[in-house]
């Protein structure tokens, strides 16, 4: 039975209001000139100033007479013991830009750019970043000695080098922030506590992008683009995870230097272009390869690696706020930023049912040791790309897009959590009983339940090669343009189409995909009519 006071407090209502305001000012000055019908010059200078402000306020009320009176004004009172909460953030940025573009006879091209940016997101003495770029190009197909090659429509060589900056993090990462307790007063002073650590040395992440490329068009059907790049990043912006004892979950710091290099190849072919038969088919594909290497780390990052060694393979998960046996992110010079660190495993010992490990020095042991972790894989794929086609025939159209990745590895945490580290008080995977070691001499995929290393720490046994193929989109349609009733002039255009994304996925690794984006499959039908 409820008391009168409890009865009139039934039901709660939470209301949140938020808004974001962006103000920008841009002033630009352009100059262009053409002379002797061969020289083309364009120059530009620009100044910009901007501010982005966001704020949100949340409050709760309670006490509703019935579920029909569900607007907040029908509440009896604010939530007992509750008070309004919210957040706000402000970021400001200004920049100065100057650029020059020059072309001679549509054959030789030159680009130069300089940009100075200042952002309030960085430390007080590190707010300005200076970036420049230079590029050259040569349209070989416009040379006189190439005019006899009628099958060649475009042949262009290009090269560029320059710097870009990144500030991809939230406001107030460079300064200390506090929360005040308006209801806690001592000696007429309200209480407060430190919410985040200051980092006055936080500065722009800079990437030097060196690129050479080729553009080719031949036979009026085939287009090819090739790029080779080397990207050197300094002052690498990285969120550093802290142990719970620090009082903060993470902070942002410039932690070192890294290098990415690789190539990108894109091709498209107009395979069929028959207007008489109203048949058109375009095919496209791309291939990308990238390698990543850490060139330098600072002392803070090195200390963070040491602290993870002391965690004995149990890491702090930022999302669940709990300990996890997922391989921790570690940074080591000469290694990839996406390297998978684990202890090498020789599998399950048929005689004992325990996992047999290989130490860093090559000795056999049944004991998992954090000091024996080495790089056992890399999440970065060796090759990635897309392909697909666009077909149109007498009003029918089919457009498809596929994504593929070849090579690289992943740590199959699903097997770890659902089989070896499962909670026996709940429903479990059948492999907990069918796949584990039970009797001497048995060859098993999973260790025995009474293994002294109860929790399975990062081990190469769960590092698996990952290749996959996804059909990312399918669009089927019919345009009624050729139908007789369209000739009456009442309807100008009528088209029916069906769209589906994430059609299927084939993978060499079986694991839980979850329900979060980007794995939300959607279907849509559309009817377009123009009268």
Model regions: which residues?
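Extracellular/periplasmic, surface-exposed regions of secreted and cell-surface proteins
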Residues: 1-3, 7-320, 458-531
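Flexible glycine-rich, low-complexity coil/linker segments exposed to the extracellular/periplasmic environment
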Residues: 2-12, 69-89, 182-195, 311-376, ...
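Extracytoplasmic gating/loop element in the C-terminal half of outer-membrane beta-barrel translocons
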Residues: 119, 350, 405-494, 500
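Gram-negative outer-membrane beta-barrel transporters
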Residues: 256-381, 405-408, 414
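Extra-cytoplasmic beta-strand recognition segments
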Residues: 385
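Transmembrane alpha-helix/helix-exit interface in multi-pass inner-membrane proteins
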Residues: 401-403
């Amino acid at each position: 039975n409820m008391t009168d006071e409890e009865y009139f407090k039934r039901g709660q209502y939470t209301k949140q209001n938020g808004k974001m305001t962006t103000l920008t000012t841009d002033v630009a000055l352009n100059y262009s000139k053409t002379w002797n019908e061969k020289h083309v010059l364009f120059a530009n200078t620009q100044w910009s100033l901007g501010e982005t402000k966001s704020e949100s306020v949340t409050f709760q009320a309670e006490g509703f007479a019935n579920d029909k009176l569900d607007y907040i004004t029908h509440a009896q009172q604010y939530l007992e013991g509750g008070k309004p909460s919210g957040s706000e953030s402000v970021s400001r940025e200004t920049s100065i830009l100057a650029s020059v573009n020059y072309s001679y006879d549509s054959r030789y091209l030159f680009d130069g750019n300089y940009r100075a940016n200042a952002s309030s997101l960085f430390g007080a003495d590190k707010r300005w970043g200076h970036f420049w770029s230079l590029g050259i190009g040569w349209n070989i197909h416009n040379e006189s000695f190439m005019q006899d090659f009628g099958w060649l429509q475009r042949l262009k060589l290009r090269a560029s080098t320059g710097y870009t900056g990144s500030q991809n993090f939230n406001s107030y990462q460079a300064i200390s922030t506090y929360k005040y307790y308006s209801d806690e007063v001592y000696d007429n002073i309200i209480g407060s506590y430190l919410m985040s650590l200051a980092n006055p040395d936080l500065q722009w992440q800079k990437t030097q992008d060196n690129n050479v490329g080729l553009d080719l068009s031949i036979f009026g059907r085939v287009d090819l683009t090739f790029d080779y790049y080397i990207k050197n990043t300094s002052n690498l912006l990285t969120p550093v995870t802290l142990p719970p004892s620090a009082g903060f979950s993470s902070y942002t710091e410039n932690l070192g230097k890294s290098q990415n290099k690789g190539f990108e190849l894109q091709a498209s072919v107009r395979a069929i272009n028959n207007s008489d038969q109203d048949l058109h088919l375009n095919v496209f594909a791309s291939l990308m390869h990238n390698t990543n290497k850490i060139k330098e780390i600072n002392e803070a990052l090195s200390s963070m690696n040491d602290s993870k060694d002391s965690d004995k393979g149990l890491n702090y998960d930022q999302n669940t706020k709990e300990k996890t046996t997922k391989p921790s992110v570690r940074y080591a010079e000469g290694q990839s930023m996406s390297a998978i660190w684990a202890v090498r495993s020789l599998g399950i010992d048929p005689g004992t049912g325990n996992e047999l490990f290989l130490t860093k020095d090559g000795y056999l042991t049944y004991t998992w040791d954090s000091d024996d972790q080495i790089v056992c894989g890399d999440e970065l794929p060796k090759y990635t790309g897309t392909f697909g086609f666009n077909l149109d025939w007498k009003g029918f159209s089919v457009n498809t897009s596929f994504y593929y990745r070849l090579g690289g590895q992943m740590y199959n945490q699903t097997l770890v959590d659902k089989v070896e580290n499962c909670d026996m008080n709940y429903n479990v995977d059948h492999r907990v009983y069918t796949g584990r070691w039970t009797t001497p001499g048995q060859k098993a995929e999973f260790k025995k339940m009474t293994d002294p290393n109860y929790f399975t720490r990062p081990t190469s046994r769960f590092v698996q090669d990952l290749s996959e193929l996804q059909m990312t989109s399918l669009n089927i349609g019919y345009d009624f343009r050729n139908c007789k009733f369209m000739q009456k002039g009442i309807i100008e255009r009528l088209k029916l189409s069906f769209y589906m994304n994430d059609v299927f996925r084939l993978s060499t690794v079986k694991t839980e995909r979850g329900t979060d984006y980007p794995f939300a499959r959607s279907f849509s039908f559309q009817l377009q009519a123009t009268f």
